[in-house]
């Protein structure tokens, strides 16, 4: 991607990005799959260090449009063009100083290396899937079929996720919840 001129180095911190997005302008900052959409502050500046970002405009100029098949919550074929991805995703980080590769590039390459043909994931990763498809296409990797499922939530509507310190299903069972109670709680 670097040799194709599709990446650049970015020295912005998260604070720099928040400050740039807080500057007076029309409309509010767009929140993408990785948080606030990066405004492109370092694009074209020729920095030689910092995070490596994908220049989404150049990437999409090369690809035109990308699409993936979805069999889950948003059934159908989903197509994304340059304008949509630039506005809603921006120039995503592919590598940082502290981490050699991002989740996005890792999952695209790893799925291909393992011969994955179907991916099932939570609907909270739907927007990130477009990034993965862009990377798959740019790298000449196969694009699997995707199935995004509803998130499993507790009786208060909070999603059950380790990163949110959610209670494990085993804890509900230990407190006397039956399998039927748990199915009802998560909407099955």
Regions found by a protein language model. Give the residues of each.
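A generic alpha-helix structural signal
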Residues: 2, 129-133, 183-186
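Extended, charge-rich low-complexity interaction segments
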Residues: 174-188
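Residue-level detector of family-conserved "landmark" positions at structurally sensitive sites
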Residues: 11-12, 146, 182
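Contiguous mid-protein beta-loop-alpha structural module that forms a pocket-lining wall or clamp
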Residues: 3-16, 22
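Active-site cores that bind ATP or allylic diphosphates and position pyrophosphate for catalysis
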Residues: 15-161, 168-173
């Amino acid at each position: 991607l670097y040799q194709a001129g599709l990446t650049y180095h970015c020295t912005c911190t998260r604070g720099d990005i928040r400050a740039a997005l807080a500057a007076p302008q029309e409309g509010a900052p767009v929140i993408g799959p990785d948080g606030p959409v990066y405004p492109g502050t370092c694009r074209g500046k020729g920095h030689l260090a910092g995070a490596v970002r994908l220049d989404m405009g150049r990437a999409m100029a090369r690809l035109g449009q990308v699409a993936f098949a979805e069999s889950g919550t948003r059934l159908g074929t989903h197509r994304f063009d340059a304008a949509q991805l630039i506005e809603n995703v921006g120039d995503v980080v592919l590598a940082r100083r502290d981490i050699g590769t991002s989740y996005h590039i890792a999952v695209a390459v790893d799925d291909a290396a393992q011969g994955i043909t179907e991916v099932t994931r939570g609907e909270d990763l739907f927007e990130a899937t477009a990034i993965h498809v862009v990377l798959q296409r740019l790298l000449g990797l196969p694009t699997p079929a995707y199935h995004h499922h509803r998130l499993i939530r507790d009786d208060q509507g909070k999603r059950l996720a380790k990163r949110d310190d959610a209670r494990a299903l085993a804890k509900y069972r230990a407190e006397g919840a039956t399998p039927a109670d748990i199915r009802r709680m998560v909407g099955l």
